[in-house]
Amino acid sequence: MRRTLLVTNDFPPVVGGIQSYLDDYTRRLPADDLTVLASTPPEGPGAAAAHDAALAFDVVRMPTRMLLPTPDVRARMQRIIRERAIETVWFGAAAPLGLLGRAARDAGASRVIVSTHGHEVGWSMIPGARLALRRIFREADVVTHISDYTLGRLRPFMPPGRQVLRLPSGVDVERFRPDADARSRLRARYGLGGAPTVVCVSRLVARKGQDSLIGAWPRVVERVPGARLVIVGWGPYARRLALLKRRSPVRDSIILTGAVPPDELPGHVAMGDVFAMPCRTRGGGLDVEGLGIVFLEASATGLPVIAGTSGGAPETVEDGVTGDVVDGRDGDALVAALVRQLSDPGLRERMGRAGRELMERRWTWPGLVAGLVEAIDAR
């Protein structure tokens, strides 16, 4: 692989969707040819050093919590390009750091790749930000996208003929798989027994729709007695969800686990019978689900899924085959999907098996990484 510099404001140990996305890709690229320029996490340089020491490639941290296309970031990037003979610069999130594309070329890089996610769609709706997107895409050789939805929203701002590459998250089908031992252990931890259980594993933010699950739950329990809802994760919406749980007439059937260790995430998916995250677009279209890696992980684990209609989320599901796609704002549709799946073990088994087969066929890492390397190496 050509010598590559990843410039990103989104990198572990900070937790988030883009952080996980870049972590998954960088760990699979040839380490000797990769350098990362990243910000320092809120936990401080010690946390960054501890994380980076376990990586096979070099990570250069700037002493700031956020990288922006400022003169100091530009200068540091250009110095790395010159000192390490970098040929390809990859901006892990196109906006806003992709504005440094021209500066990367000025320092000697011959190729620029920018990766888009969900937030660039928000930028595309703001007049001033649209101009920035046009400039970012003009300076790039390749624009990657995580879903057909995001590509459709962003292509009008790209120059004619700009090369695009589908580069969604893959799923590790060895890590996320049916796991009877983890399922048994965690169901015992939370006192689930043999209860039909819906799990939602995600960051707690309003877009994800955990509040809709809690709101729908009394009607679900009425039709599926003994059903349990387990919401896994942490985030700014945690306090709101805790309040909704306390006010629910079926609060005893709802569990909020809080944050769990990363190595326990696959097991928390596996302990469920159904995975549901009825995500919905918010903020007049500014806050949208770019894809939804959690749906892929649930399918790989052999669970039927219920996904919302926001952004690219429906692209992770074969509707009616691996799960159901519902409008996250339609409580009746959500209740119907939850009850249908919880009430029919045969349906759950068929959907789960189909989901696992789909992940193995279309969403595994080797082919996705090969496509990225090909884009990096192209002349």
Label each region the model flagged.
Residues 91-97:
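Short His-centered aromatic/hydrophobic patch
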Residues 149, 170:
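Carbohydrate-associated surface elements
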Residues 192-208, 214-218:
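Conserved donor-binding/catalytic core segment of Leloir-type glycosyltransferases
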Residues 226, 333, 340, 347-361:
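A short, well-ordered alpha-helix in the C-terminal region of glycosyltransferases
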